[in-house]
């Protein structure tokens, strides 16, 4: 289970709370939609879960373990994330290398890495884009590459 437990978030001390005493939990395999108006904190919740932001108070728990102060690179072992603007995260020379970047940094090599990339590309119908430069793709194709990158990491959440 992945949880936000009584989390309060503000961008800096002295500024108003963006989120106040929020508690949410996510079970493995559960699909959750966080909806609301612009600026209501949807992206902030995902940034807190992934470690891209730190709460002012409260905890982020992974199977009961406090991971609040862990870096995003540590949390990427169990949390996958697709950015709203995927072109901001793409910097590899080919789609295949872009998709392989995360699993490679998780320690996957050789056949294990190739299998993760091939499966993610098949699941997102991006095989034909394998040798393309990600930043020149259409926004829709960039989004599919970003989804493939998250899938290739084979995270729990």
Q: Which residues fall in each region the model found?
A:
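A short, flexible loop at the N-terminus of ABC-type nucleotide-binding domains that lies
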Residues: 1, 9-21, 28, 69-71, ...
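The feature captures the beta-strand-to-loop junction immediately N-terminal to the Walker
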Residues: 35-37
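Helix-to-loop junction immediately C-terminal to a conserved catalytic motif
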Residues: 50
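Conserved ABC transporter NBD signature motif
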Residues: 58-66, 75
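Conserved ABC ATPase "signature" region
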Residues: 111-129
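Conserved ABC ATPase signature
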Residues: 133-137, 141
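Hydrophobic anchor residue at the start of the ABC signature
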Residues: 147
